Amino acid sequence: MTLNNLGTGTSTGVPSIACDCETCLSTDPRDKRLRVSVLIEHGGKTILVDTSSDFRQQALRANIRYLDAVMITHCHVDHVFGLDDIRPLNFRYGAMPIFANAIAWIDLRRIFKYIFEPTHVGGGLPQLIPHTVVHNSPFCIGDIEITPLEVIHGKLP
């Protein structure tokens, strides 16, 4: 199994706009990080975890030519705002399986209303095949077994 961290930056990316901290001013290439997304390759399957706001740039940089599926961990902007950029893959290969939990699907339908309730197609819409996952209930993509875990993220209690 190969994991390719396409982005490991914060929600604003690194460097952050207008930030004068040591990291953001650094010339070290390790301090230039895109927002979070991971590419998993195993057994001939390619899975993307989260479509970050930087997904287009990440896909071009990593030469992503095909995806078997996308998994959405949660619907913070930095994890889903690249969803529209799967369209070129849809144009070539058709609809794509997207895996997310029920709460994420509610948010995705609200955030991307134009995909789920289209009024104007324009340059095309992302073509999704929705799959709802349940925490602690394994599912498979090809021969890859995945067990979604609930993680507290963002503001802690």
Regions inferred by a protein language model and the residue ranges of each:
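Binuclear metal-dependent hydrolase catalytic cores
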Residues: M1-P157
